[in-house]
Curated annotation (Swiss-Prot):
The enzyme's E.C. designation: 1.18.6.1
Modified residues (ADP-ribosylarginine): R98
Alphabetized PROSITE patterns for the sequence: NIFH_FRXC_1, NIFH_FRXC_2, NIFH_FRXC_3
Protein name as annotated: Nitrogenase iron protein
Gene Ontology biological process: nitrogen fixation
Classification via NCBIfam families: F430_CfbC, nifH
Source organism (scientific name): Methanoculleus marisnigri (strain ATCC 35101 / DSM 1498 / JR1)
Length: 272
C-alpha cells in the first residue's frame, strides 16, 4: 500500500489537485482512499459530485466514536474512490488539528486505512502537531509539496520541508519528500522559479499544472476535470501526475532554506 500526502498553503489548489490525482489513479484500476485533513472539509466534494459528506469530528460530537461504523464515515465517489473528511472544531472553539488525530484513531479502529493508495490532503499553512500527524506517525510515507510561484506559497512549502526534515530524524517516522508540484498562477517565470526552489531544498519538480479555465468549469459542474473533460489537455496533466506519483521511487530528506536564503532566492526571480 502506498500512502502519500499533499501539503500546501490554503487556497493553492491542493484539494483540486488531490481529487483529480485520486480520480486519475482510480482510472488505472487502483483502490483509492482520499482523506481530507482540512477544517474546510471540501477535499472530496468534487469526487462526491458536490455532496458535503459528514465529517468525522461532527459524527463524534453527535454520537461518540464508539457508535460510528465504517459506512458512517467512508463514502464512495467517482470511480469508487473512498472518501473521508476529518472536519474541524466549531468556530472559535478547540483545535483544528484534533480532527485529524480523531480521524486517524477512528479509521484505525474501523480497519479502514487500506487500499492500493491512500491520499492525504492536508492543510499546510501551520504544521502543528495535529496537521503533522500523517507525517509524524508514519502514515504518509511520501510527502508532495503543492505550491505556486507566489512567495507566501513558497514560504509555506519551505516550512513543510522543515517539518519533514525534523520528523525524519525520529525513528518512528518514515516520511520523505516525494517532490514538488507547481499549481501555476500564471506568474512570469513561475515554472523556473518552482523548479529551482525544488532543487535548492534537495528535491525535484515532478509536475507543472498549468492554470486552466476548465478547472473552474468542471467544479461548477461539481466534478473533477478527469471526469468532466477526460480527453482534455488538463486531464492529461493529472493523469501523468498520477503515473509519476504511483511509480515514484525517488524520495529525499529535504534541506529547507533559512529565511534569509528564502528572501534572497525570491529576489533572484523578481523583475524589479
Amino acid at each position: 500500500m502506498k500512502q502519500i500526502a499533499l501539503y500546501g498553503k490554503g487556497g493553492i489548489g491542493k484539494s483540486t489537485t488531490a481529487a483529480n490525482l485520486s480520480a486519475a489513479l482510480a482510472g488505472e484500476g487502483l483502490d483509492i482512499l482520499q482523506i481530507g485533513c482540512d477544517p474546510k472539509h471540501d477535499s472530496t466534494r468534487m469526487l462526491m459530485h458536490g455532496t458535503w459528506i459528514p465529517t468525522v469530528l461532527d459524527l463524534i460530537r453527535e454520537r461518540g466514536d464508539e457508535k460510528i461504523t465504517v459506512d458512517d464515515v467512508v463514502y464512495r465517489g467517482f470511480r469508487g474512490v473512498r472518501c473521508v473528511e476529518a472536519g474541524g472544531p466549531e468556530p472559535g472553539i478547540g483545535c483544528a488539528g484534533r480532527g485529524i488525530i480523531a480521524t486517524f484513531q477512528l479509521l484505525e479502529r474501523l480497519n479502514a486505512l487500506k487500499g492500493d493508495v491512500i491520499v492525504y490532503d492536508v492543510l499546510g499553512d501551520v504544521v502543528c502537531g495535529g496537521f503533522a500527524m500523517p507525517m509524524r506517525e508514519g502514515y504518509a510515507q511520501e510527502i508532495y509539496l503543492v505550491t505556486s510561484g507566489e512567495l507566501m506559497s513558497i514560504y509555506a512549502a519551505n516550512n513543510i520541508a522543515k517539518a519533514i526534515a525534523r520528523l525524519s530524524r525520529r525513528v518512528r517516522s518514515r516520511c520523505t519528500l516525494g517532490g514538488v508540484i507547481c499549481n501555476a498562477k500564471n506568474i512570469e517565470g513561475e515554472r523556473e522559479l518552482v523548479d529551482e526552489f525544488a532543487r535548492r531544498i534537495g528535491s525535484r519538480l515532478i509536475a507543472y499544472i498549468p492554470r486552466s479555465r476548465i478547472v473552474q468549469v468542471a467544479e461548477l459542474q461539481k466534478q473533477t476535470v478527469v471526469e468532466y473533460a477526460p480527453e482534455s489537455d488538463q486531464a492529461a496533466v493529472y493523469q501523468e501526475l498520477a503515473r509519476t506519483v504511483y511509480g515514484n521511487e525517488t524520495t529525499s530528506i529535504p534541506t529547507p532554506l533559512e529565511m534569509d536564503e528564502l528572501e534572497s532566492f525570491a529576489l533572484e526571480f523578481v523583475q524589479v
